[in-house]
Amino acid sequence: MRYLPLTPEDRTEMLARIGAPSVDALFADIPAAKLDPALADLPAHKTELSVERTLGALSAQNVPAGSVPFFVGAGAYRHHVPATVDHLIQRSEFLTSYTPYQPEIAQGTLQYLFEFQTQVGELTGMEVANASMYDGSTAAAEAVLMAHRVTKRRKAVVAGNVHPHYRETIATLSLYADDAVVALSPVPQGGEDILSAIDGETSCVVVQSPDVFGNIVDLKPIAEKAHAAGALLIAVFTEVVSLGLIEPPGAQGADIVVGEGQSIGNPLTFGGPYVGLFATRQKYVRQMPGRLAGETVDASGKRGFVLTLSTREQHIRREKATSNICTNSGLCALAFTIHLTLLGETGLRKLARLNHANACKLADKLAAVPGVQVLNSAFFNEFTLRVPGKAVDVIEKLAAKGVLGGVPYARLAPKAGLDDLILVAATEINTDEDRAAYAAALKEVLA
């Protein structure tokens, strides 16, 4: 995209039209204390070639994930995406299409959204899923607001082991909705006491499995306690591949299942765009945010697809809308659908088992390093290390040796007081050589 700046003549004409003698006069209403004097000393303009060189030098400082042993996760995971996925989503009818308001000319888009919803419903063990959300964290926040509408209560209990970024998003949306959020303290080893926080005023309980530390959580007793109190259980996940191996949240009693779908079909891409997954029970479908693609028949009796429910503020009155979500993550949802279709049920299960096996091998190697403790007993493809000293320092020293060893929990939650923990993820991408390099580098760093 080219940047075409205004000429001095353009500015003079615009100021004259609105009756302002100068640019300073135009902004005279802004208090001087609020103005940044540094903006007046911006460097002179550069040529396009010069800008390209400057940006190229900056980007050269990045370390491509595929160039080093890579064990970073904590909500965004590096998986292999088949070339077929990118090839298909770049077809112009998919890449440039917008909201399918006219079903007679958008059957392809509506059908893949319908297939996406079907896949999400099967993965989560739920009866209905929407056409995607922005990402996992916003899906979690919308789930809390939905639970408040269903139960007519305003108190949400959020487990301490839910990803800190998800907790922040929930707290932000709940603040403006005038809701109460009871956030528990994190318990890295798992087994946090969620049940005692549930009472007769609770609208929902938000639990993540695998949680941010990698622990697999048994949702059934939490679901029983929540339902006994008249509350809903919201199950959250950040690693959708785990559903190829772990019992679906719906089968464990969850009422709403939300999470991040990035791991299937979508690369890391600097943290977005991603695709939020949202599924629930049929009886709650009219309180579900976003939109729903449904199957019907046309005037000739042929099978067709339409937007069935779109209770969002673009379509109805704002005060009646279930969500303000606008354009959903449609292209990312298509990538998810294509990749999962290529995998199939058997392929997804094999992929999940490979992830788990690689993580177990890595955990065994790292646990053998003196001073290192693996905190998890049951995990999928991510686990937590306790290391001597500050985890941030250890990670930086590992990076200097060419190993991206994970995410210090302190970077996600600086005030949690868990400065010695590292979240480590292993996927199908990692090799035996990668694992050996990590263990050797960690041993040297801690020596």
Curated annotation (Swiss-Prot):
EC number: 1.4.4.2
Molecular functions per Gene Ontology: glycine dehydrogenase (decarboxylating) activity
Keyword check for Transport: no
Pfam family, one: GDC-P
GO terms of biological process kind: glycine decarboxylation via glycine cleavage system; nucleoside metabolic process
Top-level taxon of origin: Bacteria
Keywords of the record: Oxidoreductase
CDD domains noted in UniProt: GDC-P
Keyword hit for Oxidoreductase: yes
Reactions catalysed: N(6)-[(R)-lipoyl]-L-lysyl-[glycine-cleavage complex H protein] + glycine + H(+) = N(6)-[(R)-S(8)-aminomethyldihydrolipoyl]-L-lysyl-[glycine-cleavage complex H protein] + CO2
Enzyme class per UniProt: oxidoreductase
Main function: The glycine cleavage system catalyzes the degradation of glycine. The P protein binds the alpha-amino group of glycine through its pyridoxal phosphate cofactor; CO(2) is released and the remaining methylamine moiety is then transferred to the lipoamide cofactor of the H protein.
Family membership noted in the UniProt record: Belongs to the GcvP family. N-terminal subunit subfamily.
Complexes and interactors: The glycine cleavage system is composed of four proteins: P, T, L and H. In this organism, the P 'protein' is a heterodimer of two subunits.
HAMAP family in UniProt: GcvPA (MF_00712)
Protein name, entry field: Probable glycine dehydrogenase (decarboxylating) subunit 1
Source species: Azorhizobium caulinodans (strain ATCC 43989 / DSM 5975 / JCM 20966 / LMG 6465 / NBRC 14845 / NCIMB 13405 / ORS 571)
Name of the gene this protein is made from: gcvPA
